[in-house]
Amino acid sequence: MLLRPSSTSKSRAKNQLIWDQLILSRCKVTKKNRHKGNKCKKNTLFCNFSCVIGKKCVILHPKLHSHEVKVIIDAHIPYLKGSLEPYASVVYLEPSEITASTVRDADCVIVRTRTRADACLLEGSHVKLVLTATIGYDHINTAYCLDHGIEWHNCPGCNAGGVCDYVESALQQLGLFAKKRTIGIVGVGHVGSLVEQMAARRGWDVVVCDPLRAKHEQATSCGNRFMAIEAVAAVADVITFHTPLTFTGSYPTYHLCNADLLRACKPDALIINSARGGIVDEVALLSSGHAAVIDCWENEPLISQEVLRHAAIATMHIAGYTRLGKYKASEMVLAHFNRFFHTDARMVETMRFPEHQLFDIESVSRSLKAQPERFEQLREAYVLR
């Protein structure tokens, strides 16, 4: 709920200006000071988007200020249309149309991985909130956003079930469930945890690597079932990656699957990358000769033809493309929007989708191998499972 100051005729213009600037910029008072009721430079007392000028306040429903919030949305994000319109001026654009000029006067942008939310897009704009309807967020320059007071959110776990189904469908297609094997899972978060459950249900042995979780479980005395990645590689018949793509920090994942790791693998091990392009060093993969299932590629959409021919199964970054996953992502986007702008946007209709389903992954692979130059078009045309 927003609080709008009442005012005398004498001060109305001044207070209106303060309010308008506050509602769009959320005055730059640090979180540390915000909840202490400190004054911003405009002499406005406030706490997390609520505002007090003088002693009198009246309640203002956010809909009354809907004209002040402009939102740019990737037109290919499903299930959002109609949800934000009561609260904002909404423009739906093709990914190629989301540019610095089109977002300049927007307060919020809602994108997918095709749009890079960086200085080139955001510099000089009014954008204060960036939302991506995806698990991955390496297309967002988070450092730039932090430095410029722009809040951002991704949708962790939204399509975890779909990616798990993708991995299971690939293993089924390759006939690997015919006997008991060992699967190594690198990254045991939303997706990796589901893959672990699936493999156990199939009767496979499971070994896992996740340094961040291992560190946490050690600190909380939960024991430690995690192994070093080299130890996982030495025993696994299948290694599947489910990490974000990171370049810095204690455990960067760029080219995590490199020549050294591949040398530690069994010669007949299968490598699966349905996480992010760049986690697997594709040149090293070719040199090693290991079989691979690849959904996420380096240099998308201009993928390597040689790697494409080498892959046992090759798809166009659609592992998480399920109706359920997209619906969950849109729900999460609305939740973030509501928290930021103090609105009450809801999904237009409630829908139910299957939680688990295998699919014909081979036909998708054949389509890409037959026309790799149409990577992006095939991805856009892919029918949600």
Predicted regions and their residues:
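N-terminal amphipathic/hydrophobic targeting modules at extreme N-termini
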Residues: 13-25, 47-48, 57
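Short, positively charged and aromatic/hydrophobic N-terminal segments
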Residues: 29, 45-48, 52-59, 63
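N-terminal glycine-/charge-rich "phosphate-binding" loop or analogous flexible N-terminal tail
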Residues: 61-106, 207
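Phosphate/diphosphate ligand-binding glycine-rich loop within oxidoreductases
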Residues: 74, 108-178
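Rossmann-like adenosine-cofactor binding region
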Residues: 117-118, 215-305
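Glycine-rich adenosine-cofactor-binding loop
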Residues: 181-200
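NAD(P)-binding Rossmann-fold cofactor-contacting core
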Residues: 202-219
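Rossmann-like dinucleotide-binding domain for NAD(H)/NADP(H)
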Residues: 268, 274-385
